[in-house]
Structure formats: C-alpha cells, structure tokens
Amino acid sequence: MMPLRYSKLNVFAGFPLFLRLNLFTMSKVNIGLVQMSCTGNKEENLKKALAKTKEAATKGAQIVCLQELFTSLYFCDVEDYENFKLAEAIPGPSTDALSAVAKEMGVVIIASLFEKRTQGIYHNTTAVIDADGSYLGKYRKMHIPDDPAYYEKFYFTPGDLGYKVFKTKFATLGVLICWDQWYPEAARITSLMGAEILFYPTAIGWATSQDEATNTEQYNAWQTIQRSHAVANGVHVVSVNRVGLEQNGSMKFWGGSFVSNPFGTFIYKASHEDEETTVVEIDTAKTDSYRTHWPFLRDRRIDSYQPITKRFIDEE
C-alpha cells in the first residue's frame, strides 16, 4: 500500500470528515534517514540532498532527516574566515528548494544549515518544513563544541531560541543538533515539551590517525548516550550522521545513523562506510506503553533538582 501524501487529499474528498481525519492521524510514521558524503561544492551537495529526499519519499518516507550542515564539507576543522561565505539566511535559498520538494512529495523535511542571522552573528541551525511545503520554524544549536578539528565556537553563536518542538503533519518532532546529544537536559526538556520523536542531525567521526580501540570507544559512547535519552524519556530517537573521508583524509565520518525505540533497542543501524537512504517505520502510539511500564517521568522528583542549574556543586 502506498503511503498517504498531502497531494492526494483530494482522493478522499468524498469520505466523511471523521474518517478523513483518522486517515491522517495514524500513529505509525515512516522516517527517512539520509546518510551521505559531501564535497566542497555547495550547489552539488544541495542537489544531492534533494534527490535523496525524493528517493526516501518514493520509498514511503513521511518525515526525512538530513545530516548536520549537509550543504558543505564539515568546515569547522579549521578556523577560516572564508568559510563564513557558506552561510545563508533561514528561510533562504536552501529552505526554498527544500520546501518545493516537501510540497511535491508530501514529506516533512528536517534540514541542518549554516545560518547567517545578521552581520557577525551566525548559527548552526535546523529548519523544519512541513509536508505542504510550509516553513514551520528553526532550532539553533545550544551546545557549541571547541575541540581539535571541531572548532565550532569560531563560527557559531550559541542558540537563543530555547528548546523547541514542531507540530508537523505526521508527528510532533523535537530537533537537537550533534553536540546537543551529549546533554541529557536537552533531551529531557524537549521531551517534556511534547516531542514524540527526537531527531539529531549530526557530523561526527574519528581521526584516521587514532587507534582503533579509542575510535570504537568513542563510537559506542555516541550510540549509548542517545539510546539513553530514548530510555529515560520514553521516546524514539533518530540520529543521522554524515559518512566519508574529509579534511584531506585525516577525518573519517563514521556514519552509523540509527533509530532507537524507547527501550533503547536499535530498529535500524546504518553502516560506517556507505551512503544510505533508508525508511524506517515507528509507532508513536507505543509511547504510552513504554512510559507506563517504565514510569520514569511519573517518578521524577522535580522538587529536588534545583542544584542542576549550578555549574558545579561546591562544598559549603
């Protein structure tokens, strides 16, 4: 059976209203993950992402998530003022192109872009576009790293929009970005705001000069922390990473995009090596069952958490 699309609404015009509403409020949602490699050509990367989004939609995807900063190489490996030229307004040219595809294919699109807010203020931002092509808004990355080969503080102002959820045609989405995934507070707040699914567009990899044991440890930690957010909050988690060699071969982005259910079980896991455009079905109706069997939200002691707002709890 082909998935229902925005563009097909007229087919059901003769149905009673309650039946039409029921058809489009089903709890099973098809998630498209686009794991791809990038080049130094922004236009080619965008064209490739649009094609893969269409491919995912053709396979039945209703929500498609692209990786972090998908229109370029991961440029934050160096501090170079020339890279600011890669930024654009949001909404802007890329979101316009994505909106056209969203409307054509009837899919929601989650798109991570380098945002130029104004002169001298830039953000790492994800735009969300609904299945009718309408721009729903954006989330600006809150946690900005500054590590070797990840010099994001040089480029990005920390997000100032707070944590956000987006009510799309198919589900209520929470969107966080890469380094945000290491912080349980971000996942918790977004889940408490009503997110049914947490999405993490990501750009992470390992240095090719680093030993295999360390690389494996880091990769396992990356999976574990995100799966723990799924468990602690009773939500599905979707993480979409880039793949391929960059930085003149010194950095291998490890792919490994995945979907986890609210018990932390992998529903899907991509390879380390290959580009993949995959569609995974999840059932958001099961959230209540997960949360009642493991009632972590019920048992939270919100009266005792004030110390979490401190940088460190010093001895009095």
Tell where the protein language model's regions lie, with residue ranges:
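Active-site catalytic loop in hydrolytic enzyme cores
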Residues: 87-90, 100, 117-225, 293-294
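Cys-nucleophile CN-hydrolase/nitrilase-fold catalytic domain and related Cys-dependent amidase chemistry
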Residues: 42, 51-132, 136-138, 204-228, ...
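A short C-terminal boundary segment appended to hydrolase-like catalytic domains
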Residues: 285-316
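Short, glycine-anchored, charge-dense loop/turn motifs used at functional sites
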Residues: 31, 129-136, 260-267
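CN hydrolase (nitrilase-like) catalytic-core segments centered on the catalytic cysteine
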Residues: 87-110, 178-277
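N-terminal active-site segment of His-dependent metallophosphoesterases
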Residues: 24-62, 199
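Short hydrophobic alpha-helical segments enriched in small aliphatic residues
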Residues: 11-13
